[in-house]
């Protein structure tokens, strides 16, 4: 029994090899995340007599290089939640935090949890690409929100509340009507310096050129509102440049998001569970690929409770002696990205209210009972995941083995 504890960091790791009763096989030593160093580590582990198991924390993405390469070398690798390592064996008043001490602690954890360690599954390239794209998608969505708020903050000084004039959804290229309008009519004087009929004609030609629907009543409403607005910034080239730059930045990130959304759907369609996931209510070509990206291969979960714990939507427990708390908040120890996606699915269900969907029926029942928002949304996410697990696993088991 050889326990290999690896404290992973960016570009390098600290390794310690131990046996039961504190026997040191190899004191902590550092390796680089290079082919030569990893191969040397594999040779060292294989040279040690007895079964070896390797444990590391799944910290960010740093651990993936080692986990992937060591698994390919047919070694037993287990990636553990850092929280479990941190809470393990805290029986000392001294606070020691170093890479060497952490590597030894992970090795001791390996010995203590030997029978319960779960082997790391190498994520196939397609799922890995999909998950990476989804994380990039989330990154750009945050930037889009920031860019949008930035543009609204600037445009409110030249054309107040112009962002509320249109509620058209974003196009497939990411463009939005109010953003295009603000780019052309970037100052309130761009509208009210014209006569009413001249603006209506100009707006009509703009709609035709941009391929938007034209409404004369809407044009008249815009013109009448413009006469009452009070701008702060002057109508000059400097102000125009500031607004144009903000519009260009927002359009750029919007285009990137929509191209990623399309690419994610194309990639997800190559996965075997795609038709089952897409058939579920509340899931479309955007949220479906996001779900598959974050959940990954369902077969790695042993039961329904495992997948809800992975998402952090499993109900908590608080009992002590004769005390038993009836309402306990969820663990929230799982993937926050997956929880966000699940809440978006629940939001779609609430807005579309499909009466024949069991998840919506469950949410509606909880709402009727007067449950708070987060309670019924989390309960719905838990039920959705359980159904997801059952349907996908049943479908995958029915497929012929390749």
Predicted regions and their residues:
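A detector of single, family-specific signature residues
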Residues: 1-402
């Amino acid at each position: 029994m050889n326990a290999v504890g690896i404290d992973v960091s960016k570009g390098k790791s600290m390794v310690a090899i131990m046996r039961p009763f504190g026997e040191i096989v190899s004191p902590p030593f550092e390796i680089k995340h290079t082919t030569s160093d990893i191969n040397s580590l594999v040779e060292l582990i294989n040279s040690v007599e007895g079964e070896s198991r390797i444990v590391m924390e799944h910290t960010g993405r740093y651990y993936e290089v080692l986990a992937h390469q060591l698994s390919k070398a047919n070694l037993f690798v287990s990636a553990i939640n850092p929280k479990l390592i941190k809470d393990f064996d805290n029986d000392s008043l001294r606070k020691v935090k170093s890479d060497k001490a952490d590597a030894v602690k992970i090795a001791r954890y390996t010995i203590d949890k030997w029978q319960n360690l779960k082997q790391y599954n190498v994520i196939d390239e397609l799922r890995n690409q999909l998950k990476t794209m989804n994380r990039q998608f989330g990154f750009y969505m945050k930037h889009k929100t920031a860019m949008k708020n930035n543009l609204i903050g600037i445009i409110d000084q030249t054309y107040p509340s112009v962002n509320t004039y249109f509620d058209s959804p974003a196009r497939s290229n990411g463009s939005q009507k109010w953003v295009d309008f603000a780019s052309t009519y970037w100052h309130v004087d761009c509208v009210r310096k014209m006569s009413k009929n001249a603006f209506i004609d100009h707006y009509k030609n703009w709609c035709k050129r941009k391929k938007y629907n034209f409404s004369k009543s809407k044009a008249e409403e815009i013109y009448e509102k413009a006469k009452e607005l009070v701008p702060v910034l002057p109508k000059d080239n400097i102000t125009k440049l500031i607004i144009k730059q903000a519009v260009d930045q927002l359009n750029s990130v919007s285009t990137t998001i929509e191209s990623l959304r399309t690419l994610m759907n194309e990639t997800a369609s190559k996965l075997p569970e795609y038709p089952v996931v897409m058939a579920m209510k509340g899931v479309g070509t955007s949220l479906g690929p996001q779900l598959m990206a974050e959940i990954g291969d369902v077969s790695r979960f042993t039961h329904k409770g495992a997948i809800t714990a992975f998402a952090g939507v499993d109900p908590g427990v608080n009992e002590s002696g004769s005390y038993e708390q009836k309402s306990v908040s969820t663990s929230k120890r799982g993937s926050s990205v997956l929880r966000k996606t699940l809440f978006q699915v629940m939001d779609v269900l609430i807005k579309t209210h499909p009466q024949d969907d069991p998840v919506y029926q469950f949410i509606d029942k909880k709402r009727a009972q007067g449950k708070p928002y987060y309670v019924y949304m989390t309960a719905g996410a838990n039920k959705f995941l359980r159904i997801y697990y059952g349907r996908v696993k049943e479908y995958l088991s029915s497929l012929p083995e390749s």
